[in-house]
């Protein structure tokens, strides 16, 4: 007879709770992001959406802008989001994605 593996359950974070928290923070910030960076759509994709994130995972975001930002504004957006969320983010622009990559992302993106 083996002892139950209670340590595994106690140390495993609930990834959906993490994703829910990230969604809530982004939704609350979305009006400001739309005004400041002219964002039309913002979506989450990648490991967080699939529930495969680890402690080293960044948050993958897909953004559609009404006006394409210059490099300085793009970097400022990434930094703002990293400060807001407390983790590394990777912001991809819908218009800059290769079609094959865009097709893969569109399968699991969750727009806010």
Language-model region placement:
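Conserved histidines in hydrophobic membrane contexts and catalytic metal-binding motifs
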Residues: 44
């Amino acid at each position: 007879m083996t002892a139950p593996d209670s340590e595994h359950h106690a140390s495993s974070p609930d990834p959906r709770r993490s994703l829910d928290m990230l969604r809530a923070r982004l939704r609350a910030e979305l009006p400001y992001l739309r005004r400041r960076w002219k964002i039309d759509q913002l979506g989450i994709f990648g490991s967080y959406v699939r529930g495969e994130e680890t402690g080293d995972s960044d948050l993958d975001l897909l953004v559609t802008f009404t006006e394409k930002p210059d490099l300085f504004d793009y970097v400022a957006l990434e930094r703002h989001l990293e400060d807001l969320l407390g983790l590394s983010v990777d912001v991809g622009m819908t218009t800059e994605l290769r079609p094959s990559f865009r097709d893969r992302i569109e399968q699991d993106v969750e727009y806010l």
